[in-house]
Amino acid sequence: MEDEYNYIVSGLERSGTSMMMQILYRGGFPVAFDKSRPPNEHNPKGYYELEGGKIINRLMDGTFPMEKYRGKFIKITAYGLKFLPKGKYKIIYMVRNIDEIMDSMEKMSGPIDREVEKPLFEKLNRFAMRLLEKRDDIEYIVVKYNDVIKNPKKEIERVNEFLGGRLDVDSAVQAVDPKLYRNVREK
């Protein structure tokens, strides 16, 4: 039977979307990615993206072939969710402490104006959550990055339940590497 859903991992940049794609891949769920953005010191296990993360432009102009990826997970950042055409979606939305996200971004590209950026990131997260709640063609689960690091098996079991038991949880857990959790902020 052909899968009727388009599956998406989403969230702000640096929120753990690549980690979740790795979890799904290791757990045996079909994922779609290419080699357009190779691993580097910021994501040593890879980005697991299509088209170097440039899907949003194609969603905006209606040229992204969503039907081609039915039944597979793809990664689309939070901003891109507003451009999803009508369909049938299951979305894993990753959240992470905004200060940790900004710490990670600064390590990648240098200083940012936190007083300006933090409210924008918070607003984008709220916007994405409202969109997920509002659209009747989207089923979603929110996964906290820190919870995956602290208790990977429990969180991956929760994701597995959302996906109807299609993951090999023990294999998926192996994708989580707490050593890569480098931008820690105690709450």
Segment roles from a protein language model:
Residues M1-R70, D177-K187:
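PAPS-dependent sulfotransferase catalytic core
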Residues G71-D168:
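PAPS-dependent sulfotransferase catalytic domain
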Residues Q22, N40-E41, R114, E133, ...:
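Short linear sequence motifs
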